[in-house]
Amino acid sequence: ELDHSVNGEELSRLRDEFDAVYLAIGAHSDKKLGLPGEEAPGVESAVKMLRAIGDDELPDLSGQRVCVIGGGNVAMDVARSAVRCGAEKVSIVYRRRICDMTAQDAEIAGAQAEGCEVLELTAPLAIETGEEGRVSGLRVQPQIIGEPRRGRPAPRAAATPERVIPC
C-alpha cells in the first residue's frame, strides 16, 4: 500500500504478517545548500539524478569527475550510481569525520569499495565555474572538530588554506 502512515503497533503487525516491509520516507524534493554557483550547468540534484536512474534514464558520466556533498545514505547512493554510470573519479565531500556520517556503515564501505574517495573534514564553500559557466570545481575549506553542538561533533574551519577539488 502506498501513501499510508504507519504507527508502531501497525508496524509490528506488518512485520508479523509479511516477509518484507518497505518503508519510504517520501523525500521528493531537493535540499539546496545555498552555495554560490549551485545553479550552474553541471550541478545535478540527488533527487533528480536518482529519479532519472530509477526511470532507466542513466546519465552518461564517462570520463567525468564528480563531487557528491553529504554523508547520508542518499549521498552514498548518488556516489555509487555515478561510478556505475562511468564517472572517472567520484569524491564524497563531508564536513565531519567518516565515523560521524549518518549513512549506514555498509553503504559507506560499499562506496569506498567501488572506488569513491571520501574527503572527511572538508566543508563546501562554493561551486567554481569555468569560462563557459559550467561547473569546474568545488571550493572547500578543511575542518577540525570542535565542541559538540546538539549532540553531534561541530566542525569548524581549520587554519589551513581553502582548495578547489576539480569536478
Residue positions per predicted region:
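A Rossmann-like FAD-binding core segment of flavoenzymes
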Residues: 1-31, 48, 52-58, 84-167
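Glycine-rich dinucleotide-binding loop and its adjacent helix/turn
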Residues: 30-85
